[in-house]
Amino acid sequence: MDLSELERDNTGRCRLSSPVPPVCLKEPCVLGVDEAGRGPVLGPMVYAICYCPLSRLEDLEALKVADSKTLSESERDRLFAKMEEDGDFVGWALDVLSPNLISTSMLGRVKYNLNALSHDTATGLVQFALDQGVNVAQVFVDTVGLPETYQERLQQRFPGIEVTVKAKADALYPVVSAASICAKVARDQAVKNWKFVEKLQDLDTDYGSGYPNDPKTKAWLRKHVDPVFGFPQFVRFSWRTAQSILESEAEDVKWEDSETGDPKGPGKIKSYFSESPQTCLRLPHRYFQERGLESATVL
C-alpha cells in the first residue's frame, strides 16, 4: 500500500483507492464501511470501504476475511494482498485522517467532534465510490453511536441504496470485514513509517498499543512531552489522556485575552448605553497599558 502522500505531509488527510473493477461498474454491488484507530491517542484514524458485485460475494467469503481485530498482522497483510490479486472483482478506498486533523477539528472554535468526523468521512467514501461509477446497491456499516440514528442519516443521504448499520458489523458481514482489514493494514503501515518532523531527543517507537489506558503509551507520552510546545503531531492533543499530561507536565499558559477584570462575563447590551457606573473594571489592551495611554475624557 502506497502511503507516500501521507509520509510527505502527515498533518492533514489523504485518500487512496484501488482501480475500480469493470464488473463493479455494471453489476449491483455490496459495499462495506469500517475504521481502524478510532480510540488510540497516537497515530491516524483510517476509514475504509470495500466493495464487490453481489454475484461474487461468495468469492469474497472464500478468502476467509474476518474482523481485523481477530487477525494477526501477518494474516491481515496476507488477506489484503489476496484482495489486491483479486482486483478483477474487489475494490477498495480509504481515507487517512492525521492526529493533527483530528485534534484541530475537536479543539476548534466551532467543535467538530469525533462522531461527526467519522460519519462525514464514511459518507464521503460511499459518495466517492458512487462518483467513480461503482453500482452500489447495498451498504453495510459498522456503527458509530446509535445505529438507528446513523442508519437513518445514511438512508436519507443515499435514498436509492439499501443501508444497514449494525454494531460489530465487521464480525457479521464479510464485506465489512474486508473493509476493516484494509483500514487496519493502512493504519499499521502509517504508524510504523511515521515521519516525526519534530527534533526529538532519544526518540523511541516503543509506545505500546497507542490506547489511552496502556501504561507503556502513557510512559511514552510523558517522556516526549515538551514543557512549552507539548507533544509531537503523532499525538492527538484532544484526547483527555494527553490533556491531563499537559496539565501536569507542561508550563501554564496565560493568554493575552484571558478574562482578568470581568469574571462575570459580558454584561447586557443595554449597559453599554446607560449612564450607570460600570460594576467591573474593563482593562484596556496591553498596547495602551505598556505605553501609559489612557482615554481622553476632557480636551
Swiss-Prot record:
Gene Ontology annotations of biological process type: DNA replication, removal of RNA primer; mismatch repair; RNA catabolic process
Cofactor(s) recorded in Swiss-Prot or TrEMBL: Mn(2+); Mg(2+)
Location of the protein in the cell: Nucleus
PTM-bearing positions, type Phosphothreonine: 205, 217
Region named Disordered: 250-272
Residues that bear Phosphoserine: 258
Uppermost EC category: hydrolase
GO cellular component labels: cytosol; nucleoplasm; ribonuclease H2 complex
Keyword tags: Acetylation, Endonuclease, Hydrolase, Metal-binding, Nuclease, Nucleus, Phosphoprotein
UniProt-listed PROSITE patterns: RNASE_H_2
Main location: nucleus
Residues where N-acetylmethionine is found: 1
Domain named RNase H type-2: residues: 28-251
UniProt cofactor note: Manganese or magnesium. Binds 1 divalent metal ion per monomer in the absence of substrate. May bind a second metal ion after substrate binding.
An example molecular function term from Gene Ontology annotations: metal ion binding
Family per record: Belongs to the RNase HII family. Eukaryotic subfamily.
UniProt function note: Catalytic subunit of RNase HII, an endonuclease that specifically degrades the RNA of RNA:DNA hybrids. Participates in DNA replication, possibly by mediating the removal of lagging-strand Okazaki fragment RNA primers during DNA replication. Mediates the excision of single ribonucleotides from DNA:RNA duplexes.
NCBIfam families per record: ribonuclease HII
Subunit structure and binding partners: The RNase H2 complex is a heterotrimer composed of the catalytic subunit RNASEH2A and the non-catalytic subunits RNASEH2B and RNASEH2C.
Protein name per UniProt: Ribonuclease H2 subunit A
Annotated organism of origin: Bos taurus (Bovine)
Gene: RNASEH2A
